[in-house]
Amino acid sequence: MTKFIFVTGGVVSGLGKGITSASLGMLMKARGFRTTNIKIDPYLNYDAGTMNPYQHGEVFVLDDGGEVDLDLGNYERFLDTSLSFDHNITTGKVYSAVIEKERKGEYLGATVQVIPHITNEIKERIRRIARDYDVVIVEIGGTVGDIEGMPFLEAARQMQLEEGRENVAFVHVTYVPKLKVVGEQKTKPTQHSVKELRSLGIQPDAIVARSEEPLEESARRKISLFTNVPEEAVISAYDVEDTYEVPLMLEKEGLARYLVRRLGLPEREPDLEKWREMVEKYKSLDKEVEIAIVGKYVKLADSYLSIKEALKHSSVANDVKVKIRWIEAEDVERKGVKLLEGVDGIIVPGGFGARGSEGKMMAIRYARENDIPFLGICFGFQLTVVEFARNVLGLKGAHSTEIDPQTPYPVVDLMPEQRDLDRLGGTMRLGAYPVHIKPNTLAKRLYGREIVYERHRHRWEVNPDYIEKLESAGLVFSGIAGDDERRMEILELPDHSYFIATQFHPEFKSRPMNPAPVFRGLVRAARERKYGG
């Protein structure tokens, strides 16, 4: 019988429900249970694909092409797994499905309502995923009390009734502030949040109390008393330096152990040895390199969350910490490349649109001409081609037709299948595609394989008409699409210490114990630049 754990949030948003859910999933998997995570996003968008990163953080891309919430990236990294588009349930998806069924006459003339039709659709989607698992952790986005989240909380309540209390548990993540004026942790916001949850028919089984410092015993007792949750199930989740410490903290607090007993699962000791070694190694690193990320969404670091994590994974693999220098691409246009002085490596990440593109190309040229380890990703790959065409081939005015449709040298152009589309959502080249890697190249040394599968999210590509000219000037296209040999996937400069760019997003498949090869190589090159081989 599948066990369900619903994770809800209260008091304020941004508490770390995603990390809590991912950590709990990892602890269950470490006990040998077949575990997966589902994220519910109550917004009306069908998916995250058309959202501004400043509003919602990065758009994470799955193997099947799903454009989803960044929390699914945390789930994949913590559980070392690959999820599907169905693992992200949105209000947009649910309502679209219900309206489609109504139009087909599947409700037999009934008045279609939130209860039971919307709630039934939600439950059906959760159960569809659950068939192959022992434990399913469902994170409900937003905060208890939000209008958008009400149908999902109601569906969760109904699931406990239908599946049986012994098969469904609730974990509520709250915030316990400490006021400087009185110097004590205040539990009243948590009490009110649980009161709101109970008014919806849900009694939490465990409370994860987020705070700056470890939860005081007096606060733990008070939360237990006023929320009707056992003291052992009031979990202290205080701020830590590294999110990968959270599973170890929650294990020490006994959250998974308590839920295993609560759900009648066999009690097992988790295998956390490798995870603990990884965390301890990261904390003990004494060398440091600085890598610049030159982007257009750098004011919100979550816009590039997977890149941050891939650098962290690679830092452990290379015995050196990575300090990130966040640089707004438009600032490079205004202030020049002096903003890049002293860095040990440069990344130009993905993005869309003209804003900051010239600044990104200034950074690419600086890396190329000064032999600074460089990695370009997606749009960064395309702009690397543009920069090379302009400054090495001498094609003045060369550009991508995305930015300059009238460019005399369209070295980057819209893919043929992307023309004449009447909608933006879900229409890019999305998901995992095969990439064929050429022998005797940097890419082959990094990957060690001839064929790799990497995740994509793009509409533009290197114009096949210019490939021969670019290669004759020294640019090496070392990776080619498996589905179209005229589509370039990886480029590199062989006479450079480390200069590589990819049309795909390698960060989406990077894992704590298995860093993405191009990131691992970048950090290694940065370390060698600073400390020698």
From Swiss-Prot:
Q: Which positions does UniProt annotate for ATP binding?
A: 14-19, 71
Q: Its quaternary structure?
A: Homotetramer.
Iron-sulfur: is it a keyword of this entry?
no
Q: What EC number(s) is this enzyme filed under?
A: 6.3.4.2
Q: Which HAMAP family match?
A: PyrG
Q: Which PROSITE patterns match?
A: GATASE_TYPE_1 (PS51273)
Binding of UTP occurs at 13, 186-191, 222
Note the InterPro entries from the entry: Class_I_gatase-like, CTP_synthase, CTP_synthase_N, GATASE, GATase1_CTP_Synthase, P-loop_NTPase
GO molecular function terms noted in the UniProt entry = ATP binding; CTP synthase activity; glutaminase activity; identical protein binding; metal ion binding
Protein's name in the database: CTP synthase
